[in-house]
Amino acid sequence: MSRLVYVIFLLVVVEGSRNTLERNTETNATEAKVEGKGTIKLPPNVTIPGIITFGDSIVDSGNNNHLRTALKCNFPPYGKDFPGKIATGRFSDGRVPSDIVAERLGIAETIPAYLNPKLKNEDLLKGVNFASGGSGYDPLTAKLVKVVSLSDQLKNFQEYKNKLKVIVGEEKANFLVKNSLYLVVASSNDIAHTYTARSIKYNKTSYADYLADSASKFVSALYGLGARRIGVFSAVPVGCVPAARTLRGKLKRRCSEKLNEVARNFNAKISPTLEALGKELPDSRVVLIDVCDTLNDMIENPKNYGFEVSNRGCCGTGLVEVLFLCNKINPFTCKNSSSYIFWDSYHPTEKAYQIIVDKLLGNYITKLV
């Protein structure tokens, strides 16, 4: 089968199954528990005991495995570069940003998914991951694909706090909750998917305002539950991910300026909003982590970062494959994912994540502690 015929076939499958396909495959594979060595030196007398993560598929470490949703990736070739080559449910070839941050801070090599029923008590003591692929700041985003909304992720966090108190006592539990680093990664699904469904009610500017307001309310609620060190990822150039180029960029597969404009509007709104919120909430460190400029530069200048390909993913043809379309029987998957910025048509490779984290963590960590 030629590459062109295969792509046409995949596009038909994507359109035909977008709102109807639902899977219920699960994996409870045990993740690697190797401790990270740490490459970021913290200021004297500063401790970050754990990493606690909320958001979407950029950081989901396997929570969707345990949901009745089509948005899963707990099968090969996902995870091919993960320790042990395990498809854990991370939407990448390897680890995701929250794992890499934890390693760089010397906490652990990976941060587990909270919904994994095989978690042991000791797994909870270095932080957990509540993120659910397909979620977003807009409540409709998670509802459309039957995943864990951000509001329900907060409920899971409250449950987690109660478990900590039982395991280590109230004093140690409060210390972990207060001093852990919180990562919030959302907005991509809102912009790439839900914005179209909301376009009757919102334009590009008003929808960005709505998302920024929702993000601010989420951070305030997280603070109310005890979080103090909160890093919020900016929106990324959603219009430049391979799938957006294929579905919206016409024959030349250019970036979707419409989607990128919504992302820029959101970033312009959320930046002063979070800055004001940080001043309003006592003893808080609320910081916007600007991922957009770094990823955009990587996409425009891939060779400067050691990549060869930035407009296609490694999996399959790299044009539309994601989730079940990115599978081990796809004949076009690349052999060397480290040459690609994107693993599938939406999500970066671990190598790309490592570059982003290493470029940004050193700049932002002092603001967060």
Curated annotation (Swiss-Prot):
Family assignment from sequence similarity: Belongs to the 'GDSL' lipolytic enzyme family.
Protein name, per record: GDSL esterase/lipase At5g42170
EC number, UniProt record: 3.1.1.-
Recorded GO CC terms: extracellular region
CDD domains per record: SGNH_plant_lipase_like (cd01837)
GO biological process: lipid catabolic process
GTP-binding as UniProt keyword: no
Carbohydrate attachment residues: N28, N45, N203, N336
Secretion signal span: 1-16
Keywords: Glycoprotein, Hydrolase, Lipid degradation, Lipid metabolism, Secreted, Signal
InterPro entries: GDSL (IPR001087), GDSL_lipolytic_enzyme (IPR050592), SGNH_hydro_sf (IPR036514), SGNH_plant_lipase-like (IPR035669)
Domain of life of the organism encoding this protein: Eukaryota
Enzyme type, top EC level: hydrolase
Predominant location category: secreted
Active site: S57, D344, H347
GO MF annotation list: hydrolase activity, acting on ester bonds
Localization per Swiss-Prot or TrEMBL: Secreted
UniProt keyword Signal, yes or no: yes
Species per Swiss-Prot/TrEMBL record: Arabidopsis thaliana
